[in-house]
UniProtKB/Swiss-Prot annotation:
Assembly description: The RNAP catalytic core consists of 2 alpha, 1 beta, 1 beta' and 1 omega subunit. When a sigma factor is associated with the core the holoenzyme is formed, which can initiate transcription.
Protein name (database record): DNA-directed RNA polymerase subunit beta'
SMART domains the record matches: RPOLA_N
Organism lineage: Bacteria, Pseudomonadati, Thermodesulfobacteriota, Desulfobulbia, Desulfobulbales
Binding site for Mg(2+): 460, 462, 464
Residues of the signal peptide: none
Amino acid sequence: MEELFNFFQKPKGPVKFNKVKISLASPEQIIDWSHGEVKKPETINYRTFKPERDGLFCAKVFGPVKDFECNCGKYKRMKHRGVVCEKCGVEVIQSKVRRERLGHISLAAPVAHIWFLKSLPSKIGAVLDMTLKQLEKVLYFENYAVTQSEVEELPLGTLLTEEKYRQALSEYPAQFKVGIGAEAIRELLAAQDLIGLSRVLREEMASTSSQTKRQKLGKRLFVIEAFRDSGNKPEWMILQVIPVLPPDLRPLVPLEGGRFATSDLNDLYRRVINRNNRLKRLLELDAPDIIIRNEKRMLQESVDVLFDNGRRGRVITGANKRPLKSLSDMLKGKQGRFRQNLLGKRVDYSGRSVIVVGPHLRLHQCGIPKKMALELFKPFIYNRLERKGLVTTIKSARKMVEKGAKEVWDVLEEVVTEYPVILNRAPTLHRLGMQAFEAVLIEGKAIRLHPLVCMAFNADFDGDQMAVHVPLSVEAQVEARVLMMSTNNILSPANGEPVIIPSQDIVLGLYYMTRERINVKGEGRVFSSVDEAIISYDYKETDLQAKVKVRRPEGIVDTTMGRIILGELVPKSVPFVEVNKVMSKKALAALIDYTYRHAGTKDTVILADRLKDTGYEYATRAGISICIDDMKIPATKVGLVKKGEDEVLDVEQQYSDGLITAGEKYNKVIDIWSKVSEDVANEMMDEIKTETFEDKDGNLVEGPSFNSIFVMADSGARGSRDQIRQLAGMRGLMAKPSGAIIETPIKANFREGLDVLEYFISTHGARKGLADTALKTANSGYLTRRLVDVAQEATIVEADCQTLDGIVAEPLLDGGEVLVPLGDRILGRVALEDVVDPFTGEVLVVAGEQMEEDKVAILEEAGIDRVMIRSVLTCRSKRGVCAACYGRDLGRGHLINQGEAVGVIAAQSIGEPGTQLTMRTFHIGGTASRSVEQAEIRTHRGGKVAFNNLHYVENSSGVKIVMNRNAEIFVKDEFGRDREKFKVNYGAQVLVKEGEDIERDTVLADWDAYTIPIVAEVGGIIRYGDIFNGITMQEKVDPVTGKSSMVIVHSAGGVTLNPRISVKNDRGKTLKLPDSEGFARYSLPVGSLISVEEGAEIKAGTIVGKIPRETSKTKDITGGLPRVAELFEVRKPKDPAIIARIDGKVSFGKELKGKRRVVVTPEYGEQQEYLVPKAKHIIVHEGDYVQAGEPLMEGTIVPNDILSVLGVKALAKFLVDEIQEVYRLQGVKINDKHIEVIVRQMLKRVHITRANDSKFMIGENVEWWKFEEERDRLLAEGKKPGAAEPLLLGVTKASLSTESFISAASFQETTKVLTNAAMSGRVDELLGLKENVIMGRLISAGTGINRVD
């Protein structure tokens, strides 16, 4: 009876746990888990389909095939629960135990576990101090290993070949023992004394001075201490028993025609059992040694393949030549257990369909087809039908729904009303890719989507599909409504700007209604009230675009009829000024932003919907369409193109006269055509921008044009200046697939049509665009995945970490132009110190205050240009960041809440545009857009010129030539404040005098954009040194012109030579340089051209050589994505630059073969030497003063150098600026703090340099806060703490070195991560997000933060 009651008990809840430990299994443990031994390779009987006894599917071991029914049929049904059948030995129980019961195979000979053998560095090898090759020789029966020895010449673990063994046996009979195969290795492992070994190794490490030796010992020590501390025994890496997976996890399914489909694992197990049984038989028969060895080796190989197919030897394939999936393959990769089933599951109560536009919907609604809703909400409908008493059982409810009775639809309406559903569009690149809406039932089969949320989803209606999910629990519904509702996601989490912005037709309509037209009905009328104006419009007395005056509360306003109508739509708190202008897309975005900040969410949502309706209405009324005559080709085009052709002929002539090189010719031609293309575009835009109207007095006036194409582009509805240029200007230069620009431009535009050659050239660009898109989408997705993985554990853990540290925020300048104003960089951040007005001394912002829009405006007004702000980079919170260091939650507009997953948001914000960037190339159709090289400095404001650190010589024509690198020109205002600051390149010509007053738009300096000059600082006679034709120099004769030029080349014979040009006096002595100790000797790097003849007499400031700059490639995002990935992965760039590690004066030391020696001498202390390859161009000069961190040569700076020279903050600033640069080129705005979060995660660990009394090892990498905790503990105890230096890890490395082994294993290199974790007996505390998702718990972020047990 009791049995029966047990059956009706509630099912047990899920197991509660808060940690997961992984370790090695001992043979006893495996047998303890097992429910019996699998002795035979048989699976099921092909006639009866019953499992064979003792086989791989044996019911006795794994449990019955049918619920409560033994194999022979003696016991059936519930009443015999728990009985073990005496005939067939099967326990009568539910068949689902076949999913959880393990079996085992007892091996006749031990085998090595391949993970611990082959996963580098080999764990078995580390314990025994043997190489992988040596181990394999023993394991695969080639060599003997000494397992016991009393002879000094034969220490334990010595390898002996067959003849060496015989020889040793005759020399030392009965004094040693050898073994072979896994048995020998097991014996050696069991004999290791881990505690003694680790002590010896630590002593060795302390005493050795060689870096490589220390690293080697450190690796070995790590493994040994892992075994010592985890309680795992090294001999467990050799298997004596193999567990067998439960049969329902490796099913065997009968197909029609008497065949079977089976899991590969069954084949693999079968091979192991066959070989094991054969080995047992051979051992019983006392077979010859050689046969037994062969069989043991085959057993070892079959177990290797079962665990990890293809790790050693060739991949074992099945009948259809497909590699068999081993146990490791089940875990690995995108299709493995982690990523396929644990991190990404399919969910019930979901559907997908095509989307169409729903212009009548409100912002919080979406249309769901009735048929779909009926299926999604079935259980709710059954419940409602029962409650209403329309049906009595679930079965009858189901029938009623299937019949489609009238009541069912009414019930469906009730269920769906105000029920939030979640819509998702793949690819979900950021959190706005999943939003909640209230469902509205519609006829038809397509989901209807509100047009304004398309931008967030990146959706359009050309056949996109979306998925619908139903949140079931009350909590899920609340979260969907409060957090995910589209009305609560007005701002983008990436940059805090609205994502719900009108686009396309809506913009066109609103733009059209707010434009003014000259001389239309009702112009000049004055209305006493808004109502009167609108009545006048309704009676068609006044035109929509008529200029009128109207009386409003703030006074009489000049406006137009359309703007009055629009003004009625905005909330009361938004002043009329905000809409009393032409509403382009930018203006509408600003209006929505203003409304959100001043009127709140609700009003913004209402406004957005009203704008949508009005926009559509007036776009329809406007009836804008385009025709071919709207594309006006400028009359001046022919002349401009002709002029371009003449200039190109001129350049060709210079080239054939040998005045310029092929590279210079190419660059000049490209520049000419870029310029012509621009000029034609400007002429064309001028032509369509304005048209002539007749005003009411009959005079002709110019006004903004109503040309349809111009209207579309100007409003921001569709099309760009570039596209119009191609339609009506000239198509311009195109790029080859390699990225190089083709010299011949396309002179025609699309209205005129392309000829065959032009068409052929354009196919290049177009095709490259499409190919790139496909490739780069994948790369961008991979970048996002790496970023999410590194940042997933960064959440907001506390309100304030009380740190006193922060970073400096400054506006971002480029050549005197403000690219990013200070306001953009500090908005929503928390001030670290009081911000004081430099003139009045008034405190504008108090320390610890969040800087909102109003404060930022005050700071910008006061002209403040640097503020100390809190930053996640300096946050002291452990395992996360604090709210004060993070600042504003950009997607919500207030200080961030605790528990917010800022890491994931940061990763999405950086990764999402990555894919957009990749898709950018494609719209302009591959026309080459390359900025004409900036070769001059122009002022943006007037003022007084001041030089800073500018050394120059005057050349023969009296122009100042800049002779040093960090020269700057300032423009100061009347108060003497610096208004603009420009860096001036070495070799530039300065065209103004110090102290001169200048107007705006004055050219201060210019230089050659294509070459870097080498300038003589003194006059005299030129002499060559080490310039030998055919060795260090080559005369290159141009095939076209027959002219020769001298180019310095790299050659094996000239390694020790240093090609140079010296300036000497008439007595043949090299002249000294004025104001420095050096001489007028100029080294020529490889690739430079010599510009002066030997023996020529020159004046100071003459160019003696030139180094050509790279021929320009088109600026495609290819520079972008790979560059971003390179920075985040901290890869060594292709041509790294050497940087100065100290401040000091530069001099050149004695040359080393092939390298030049740059010496930096500080005022006090040691001088430092740097060796630079001769082929590289050194950009510092004798006597220059350099600062630490400045590059000494051309090339890309290596992030790790910045970290070691200038520290963490400088590195972070470098990374943020470099990454932002790539995105800014593409016009993508990302807030700095997102990049800072990722950089913080990359800098999470420190590298132990001295261990002293701490528990760490030299060379170990640990979290900074663990190191600090240990340091504080040791100092408190009066002991000596270790020392550490900050460590910068690339995002992949950082993800793999995370605390959580579950998270790391699900990212990459699964087997390696699990092997290391098992060996160390790692415990996963389940603190991050990913590991909790995998374990099926609530994540420790957001609403789950207080719920985690």
